[in-house]
Regions:
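Extracellular glycan-modifying ectodomains
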Residues: 1-170
């Protein structure tokens, strides 16, 4: 789920959900690294690359994390020091976050139910929404979601890897 390879996916979702993604994106190479399993494998030459996508909507949006009660940017560059460099996207796995886009021309809201694979795709959808609530039901019971989300007229997107769906108990 490399972000720079997800433009077609993001555009397909945008088309189905009736909004457009402009093409004013800039691809930034953030880091080169060996993946988290590199130390356990005999592979020594393969370098992975993390790239982020910038545009005015992404750059001006903020992420509120209900667990930490803190705001961050879409890309958390401090996570590049962690074991899982892919946590740069939306600060990694969290039960519930809100993404607020102050530059949106729309009042639309989106609720995304996702696993960690959605972290790199969700930022590409920011342009179409004023607010995106991202829920990872691996970390929060669906029974208490109405304590955090007022379900009314939002678009909803379910985005899970097949492993998460096949092994889910929630």
């Amino acid at each position: 789920w490399k972000q720079e390879d997800l433009f077609d996916v993001a555009n397909t979702i945008a088309n189905q959900m009736n909004f457009e993604i402009t093409n004013n994106n800039v691809v930034n190479t953030v880091t080169n690294f060996k993946g988290s399993y590199a130390g356990r494998l005999s592979v020594t030459k393969d370098i992975d690359t993390i790239k982020t996508i910038s545009n005015p909507s992404i750059d001006n949006s903020s992420v509120y994390n209900y667990e930490t009660k803190k705001y961050t940017k879409i890309y958390d560059y401090d996570k590049l020091k962690s074991l899982d460099k892919y946590d740069i996207y939306l600060s990694g796995a969290s039960s519930i976050i809100d993404i607020v886009n102050p530059t949106s021309n729309s009042n639309r809201e989106l609720i995304v139910f996702r696993d960690s694979y959605g972290s790199s795709l969700v930022p590409l959808l920011i342009e179409g929404y004023k607010k995106i609530t991202v829920v990872d039901i691996r970390y929060v019971s669906s029974r208490i979601l109405n304590n955090y989300i007022k379900f009314k007229d939002q678009d909803v997107l379910f985005m899970y890897s097949i492993l998460t769906i096949n092994n889910s108990f929630s």
